[in-house]
Amino acid sequence: METETKRLAKINGYSNEMKEQPNPVHQPESAPVLVNRHHPWTESPEDTESRLAPVSTFADIQALDADIRLERTCLERLDALLDAVGGKNGIVVVSGYRDLAEQTEIYYSSLRENGAAYTAKFVALPGCSEHHTGLAVDVGSAAGGLDFIAPEFPDDGACGAFKARAAEFGFVQRYKAHKEYLTGISCEPWHFRYVGAPHAAIMEERDLCLEEYVEILRQERAKAGHGEASYGN
Ligand SMILES: [Zn+2]
């Protein structure tokens, strides 16, 4: 077993260039970036990809594909969360960062295989997927079928513990059934978004989806006289 220090050192090895180019996306003092059908991800793939690391950085994380990449802090916190809930054997990373070409392929293959209604519920339009940020991860139960679009992620066992402790490590279940009218996406128990622990704690406590939360931050910032906040898109 690696020590926590060694793991962090691994990530920090990848992070050297990041220190010179601070990344506003996951800093607690900035609003988490909002990506949805009304807010496409507009950053260049080169910039986004410079912040990614492969999940195989942590040899004991199970993944559907060793090439899956996540933003480095998101990956490091995912590793810590999986350790904390004893999820390294029972939980598999099914999807992470996707570029525009990959989301386009997923979108149209789902249209062909699953039809328009299903696709509209579970697959974001190319350019409008949180997976473009590297800050979203789909996880599935190793005991389930590991369906690529909708993996099983039950409420019990390691998956239940993962969900219960996700906010502590900075993750939120992004798409909940009762927020569908705001997110435009159906309930996805498997899709977690990294926003950082301070934001995740407030979102959890006040039952806010990201659309609601960034709007509250924007209003508070405007009230405080900082003008319009920028969310990076
Ligand atoms: Zn997802």
What are these model-predicted stretches?
Residues 1-96, 100-233:
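Extracytoplasmic cell-surface/polysaccharide-interacting catalytic and binding patches
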